[in-house]
Amino acid sequence: MTNRRHVPLVLAAATAVLVACNNSSTQLTSVPYGFLTFVAQKAGAGYTANAVGSFYDASGLSIPTANAPWDSCRMQAYSASSGTSLGTIFPSMNAGASIQVKVGTRTDSLFPQVVNTETQYKSRITAGIPYTPGDSVSVVIPGATGDFGYAAISFKAKTAEAFTVQPFVPPAVGSRLDLRWTPGQDLNNTMVFSFRYAGAGSDVLNQQVMCQYRDDGADSVPAKYIASWVSSPKQAWYASRVRTWVAPAGKGYFDFISTFDIPTPTAP
């Protein structure tokens, strides 16, 4: 029996594509998969994007898409570390000499860099690419030939918009937690909330209630899920608007993943 690996949509918000596994009885042949994550960062009074392109010769991946959320919660372990990159499992592919990213009248380039065991395409601007969340981005990936060459693809996609979450307080044990936030402008977003807490016998955040909702501005965490978070002496929460654009690319697939997070990371 082999493993089928899913790229969790929420983990795009952490600027790394990580791996979770479940069982499958089907052996899949390798397929080219490409990702460009576009993560909002605070930069003075405005924002920049931490843009990272990653391309893999992979098998058994399911592409994350924001327009099919599971609109529910689950409990799972939490770690502040970035987890397992796909680059530790699958070989990187060559997507060309550079990737062009255009926002408005400004054009920036992402260049290949070796990061640990894989090749990632990144900007040479340390602080990131200036933009306003919600802007449309035009991307040109030239592609390359050869056994590990990724197909050329060009597209224009909208980035995730900024949002706010209405203040809330932990409910009484046995009660649900109602959430309200600025709704998205269309159905190509999903909202992800993570309620992190220290489990029994721990003084660090090591458990979480993970919820993914339709981006309509309101939902709730059922009492049976939020109770452990409410009862823990150490708590934190995180929210992310995730927007995707998915398309075929040659014999494989490409996924543009844009996120706006609260708390919003600060640009270097």
Q: What do these predicted regions represent?
A:
Residues S24-P133:
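Solvent-exposed N-terminal domain segments of exported/luminal and surface proteins
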Residues L28-G44, V52, T145-A172:
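Short, compositionally biased P/S/T/A/G/V-rich stretches that sit at domain boundaries
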